[in-house]
Amino acid sequence: MKAFEFPNSDTPIKRHKNVAVVGGGNVAMDSVRTALRLGADNAYIVYRRGMEELPARKEEVEHAGHEGVQFKILTAPVKVIGNKEGWVCGLECLEMELGEPDASGRRRPIPKEGSNFVLKVDAVIPSIGTGANPLLAQTTPDMQFTKRGYIAVESEATGRTTKKGVFAGGDIVTGAATVILAAGAGRAAGMAIDKFLKDGEWWDPNAPKPAEAAPAPVVK
């Protein structure tokens, strides 16, 4: 992975003239701005809610606008269109309108019937969230995972998994978070690994958790 050294690296960089990035987070802003810097004539953010609901930081959105990013808000992707050669030539979209707030507290997007249109692009970049690689659970049956597919650990203070000698930390445990938290998890796991190599002790994932202490009585 040496693309950062281009042009002194053999790592290929894909360049496109019309790029659509589906999503509204910080990574989506990074992707669409990078597309412009690589020479795209048009770079779009396709987002199904309004500008006020964009989850990206305000400064990210402002900087993207200053660089020339075009925002296709209240727009949901329907399907990617390809030509006979198998290359992307368009993105079919549907106009949306905002209804009542959903469980996240943001107003729920509702499709407008008959509002389909095609955005002419030659590249579509999905940026709609992150998740754990399902291969982890499929190939490691003797390790426990959470309902969302993340690795279960004793605690973030040790990073000890249910598989003896295996430690985990960062996004694969907490879900998408920050580099600082991941670095902290690595440091904590490093100390736990050092202890394990010295004494060989491991925790029992099946041991009952200690009961929480009852609250102290209030003395009047």
Can you describe what each PLM-predicted range is?
Residues 1-16, 101-176:
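FAD-site-proximal beta/loop scaffold in flavoenzymes
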Residues 5-40:
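Rossmann-like NAD(P)H-binding beta-loop-alpha module
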Residues 24, 47-50, 171:
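Cofactor-binding loop segments of dinucleotide-utilizing enzymes, especially the Rossmann-like FAD-
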Residues 31, 172-203:
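A conserved FAD-binding loop/helix module that cradles the flavin
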Residues 32-79, 201-219:
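Rossmann-like dinucleotide-binding cores of NAD(P)H-dependent redox enzymes
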Residues 70-72, 92, 167:
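General small-molecule cofactor/ligand-binding pocket signal
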Residues 74-87, 95-100:
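A conserved short coil-to-beta-strand element within the FAD-binding core of flavoproteins
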